[in-house]
Amino acid sequence: MPMYFEEKNSIRYGKFGCYDPFPFIRAFFSTRIGGVSRPPFDRLNLGMTTEDERNRVLENRKLFFDTIKIPQSAVVIQKQIHEDRSAYVETPEFLDCTDAAYTDRPNVFLTVSAADCVPVLFAETKKKIVGVIHAGWKGTLKNIAGHTIEKIKKQFGIDGSNITAVIGPSISEKNYEVSEELADQFNSRFIVKNGYAKPHLDLWKANVVQLKNAGVENIFVSGYCTFERQDLFFSHRGSGGKSGRMLGVIGMNY
């Protein structure tokens, strides 16, 4: 499986087998298992933009980062805005108004927040570059995954063949019904109509294609649907719009 789980201190989190051969890469994805938040944010809500009690989210973040042994002082948090803006990061900081970030520096841990939108984690294993992408339907429509990779290729003079990317837990095509108006904005190969009363959008496929078109050859899809697995993950759509958030985390130690 591209993604497997570990549990420590009652905190369950995902890891990615594709990064296991590279000990300098540290990549994780939180679940809702563990933590102190109350319904509907139970339990390990890591999202500060939710209506959850701030002190509980702060406690959850401490529990999560302590468990995966990453100091919060080394963490980069984004204020995600559903656009295609990306940022090169050299030191831990708060990023205002971005949906993608990347770094070639050790001990800088990038995060992406999600609860149905597609979280992408990636690593260029030769030049030692890591990054995250937040791709909801708006970002996907703007080709944020492709634009981010192309920006990195130009900045570092690489071709993308040594980039390994992961599509993290997010809503699957089966559960992502969209309007005809929205469906018409996407390439038809990402829209499924057969068997459904309304169109369904395949964000996994769309982001895989965008990454491939940008030269990424190694792409793994976790296969976990947040809508279907609300026992493990938060789902904005599945909860009627009131849910917690997970964090994908990637960085390097060397």
Regions found by a protein language model. Give the residues of each.
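Active-site microenvironment for binding and transforming phosphate-containing groups
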Residues: M1-Y254
